[in-house]
Swiss-Prot record:
Its EC number is 2.7.8.26. GO terms for molecular function: adenosylcobinamide-GDP ribazoletransferase activity; cobalamin 5'-phosphate synthase activity. Its cofactor is Mg(2+). Pathway: Cofactor biosynthesis; adenosylcobalamin biosynthesis; adenosylcobalamin from cob(II)yrinate a,c-diamide: step 7/7. This is Adenosylcobinamide-GDP ribazoletransferase. It comes from the Archaea. NCBIfam families: cobS (TIGR00317). Belongs to the CobS family. It holds the Pfam family CobS. GO terms for biological process: cobalamin biosynthetic process. It comes from Thermococcus gammatolerans (strain DSM 15229 / JCM 11827 / EJ3). Joins adenosylcobinamide-GDP and alpha-ribazole to generate adenosylcobalamin (Ado-cobalamin). Also synthesizes adenosylcobalamin 5'-phosphate from adenosylcobinamide-GDP and alpha-ribazole 5'-phosphate. The lineage of its organism: Archaea, Methanobacteriati, Methanobacteriota, Thermococci, Thermococcales. HAMAP family: CobS (MF_00719). The gene is cobS.
Length: 233
């Protein structure tokens, strides 16, 4: 798992670039690490803890996936053929669609957290990391970037191990609080992002995978918030 840290977090450790694509199965294991600081903020109930928790999360994960979300949204929303959409996604300038997507994801997370228990971000991050694994498992790369490199290492064994690990980390929480299962709604959002990416671009690159991660997390928090509000104990 150590080799994943430099590529998916800001945690200052060295990783082996040659080995990382063979350890993608461990992506769900990153969730306890990436959500730890944010979960602590929520547990301590600090003033503006919902905002501080999201800032703590991005302090840990970095903004690379959020940047990918902006690029992805620009590409999806532009009118035209596939070539034009890919060109818009790769444009260094962020358009209004990208700005809107980033703001909406940020606000959905910030305003969902006050309605949820302190461990909600852990569940959202767990689903986010698993959704990234599912995106890589499509093995339909767009271009020859880092996403394509990771996809080359994906296989059935890694997906099976990753799924087992995901369930191992999810089910104990769901046993204690059954409503935690509602976090899986985030996976539906992530699956829709994968579908949109394949339809608009014909494959997935790092920007698409970043969008999957961000939208899955926001979708998980939103889904849980709805369930907690309407099915609260």
């Amino acid at each position: 798992m150590r080799n994943l840290l430099p590529f998916f977090t800001r945690i200052p450790v060295k990783g082996d670039f040659e080995r990382v694509r063979n350890e993608l199965w461990a992506l769900p294991l990153l969730a306890p690490l990436t959500s730890a600081l944010a979960t602590l903020v929520l547990y301590l109930e600090l003033p503006l803890s919902n905002v501080l928790a999201i800032l703590a999360l991005y302090f840990t994960t970095g903004l690379l996936h959020l940047d990918g979300l902006a690029d992805w949204a620009d590409g999806v929303m532009v009118k035209g053929d596939r070539e034009r959409k890919i060109k818009a996604m790769k444009d260094l300038n962020t358009g209004i669609a990208g700005v809107f997507a980033v703001v909406m994801v940020f606000l959905l997370q910030v305003y969902s957290l006050p309605l949820l228990p302190f461990y909600a971000l852990y569940l959202a991050e767990l689903n986010s990391k698993f959704a990234m694994l599912l995106a890589l498992a499509t093995r339909k790369p767009l271009g020859q970037g880092l996403g394509a490199y990771f996809m080359e290492g994906m296989n059935g064994r890694q997906l099976t191990l990753g799924t087992a690990l995901y369930l191992l980390l999810l089910l104990p929480v769901a046993y204690i609080e059954p409503r935690s299962i509602s976090s899986l709604l985030g996976l539906l959002a992530g699956a829709y992002v994968i579908r949109l990416s394949l339809r608009n671009f014909g494959g997935l690159n790092g920007d698409c995978i970043g969008a999957v991660a961000e939208i899955t997390r926001a979708g998980a928090l939103l889904g849980m918030a709805v369930v907690w509000v309407y099915f609260g104990g």
